[in-house]
Regions:
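A short, solvent-exposed beta-edge/loop patch
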Residues: 150-213
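Aromatic-patch recognition
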Residues: 53, 57-175
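Short N-terminal segments immediately surrounding and downstream of signal-peptide cleavage
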Residues: 25-46
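Bacterial Sec-dependent N-terminal signal peptides
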Residues: 1-32, 214
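Short, low-complexity, Pro/Ser/Thr/Gly-rich segments in the mature regions of secreted, periplasmic
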Residues: 211-223
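Glycine-centered tight beta-turn/hairpin loop motif at sheet-sheet or coil-to-beta transitions
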Residues: 48-50
Length: 223
């Protein structure tokens, strides 16, 4: 009778490699889920004085900061009051107080999205070392007075949850636009028409495209 052999060391090695690969895949996914783009892409910053600055950029949805790269180091734009608009690929961002809103619809009634997510600790008390203070950096110097450097790696014991918010701007005032009731409060005189339009077109306002469709229609109401 043949003696059975058990390759326990090989099995253990296989299980360890599988766990490592799975963890690496999850980590890679987490490292990009809190940025708008999967990697830095070329963008431009239009200053209020008309000057244009160009850099490789992305947007951090946890800290709600515009990130750019200088000499291989990732930094955050500051002095937002001097910035008019940021353009990344075909997308448009405007500074609002201390964060950036992305423009989705431009008109008398404009629609913006606040790209945002929350960082959640899954139970490990160790802190998130996502940023460290540095001195002033001379790149986009007109934009950046005090900056932070960023680590793009998210610790394994943390994960992100979506916290995106939508806003409409009318007469230079921002209003929440995350539900039909919030939108109708901005147009109380057109609430019946808005409600009927949502029903007729079967709009789901959790869907960004449907929300855009509704705000485009709202612009017709205020002509």
């Amino acid at each position: 009778m043949k003696k059975q052999t058990h390759n326990y060391p090989l099995l253990i090695l296989f299980l360890l490699l599988t766990a490592y690969c799975t963890d690496t895949q999850i980590q890679a996914q987490n490292d990009t889920t809190y940025y708008i783009f999967p990697e830095l892409v070329q963008g431009s910053v239009k200053m209020k004085d008309g000057r244009i600055e160009v850099a490789m950029m992305d947007y951090n949805k946890i800290t709600e900061e515009m990130i750019f790269e200088k000499d291989g180091v990732k930094l955050a734009l500051d002095s937002l009051q001097t910035i008019d608009t940021v353009y990344i690929e075909s997308r448009v961002f405007i500074p609002h107080i201390k964060v950036f809103y992305e423009l989705l619809v431009k008109g008398k009634v404009s629609l913006f999205v606040q790209n945002k997510c929350n960082l959640v600790d899954s139970g490990d008390p160790s802190g998130y070392g996502g940023k460290t203070e540095t001195g002033a950096v001379r790149n986009l110097s007109s934009v950046t007075n005090s900056v932070h450097t960023y680590k793009f790696k998210l610790p394994n014991n943390y994960y992100v949850t979506n916290a995106t918010l939508f806003w409409i701007a009318r007469n230079n005032t921002f209003y929440k636009a995350n539900s039909s009731s919030q939108i109708m409060k901005v147009f109380p005189e057109k609430s019946k028409e808005i409600k009927q339009f949502i029903k007729d077109h079967k709009l789901d306002l959790k869907n960004t495209d449907d929300l855009i469709t509704l705000i485009v229609k709202c612009n017709e109401f205020v002509r």
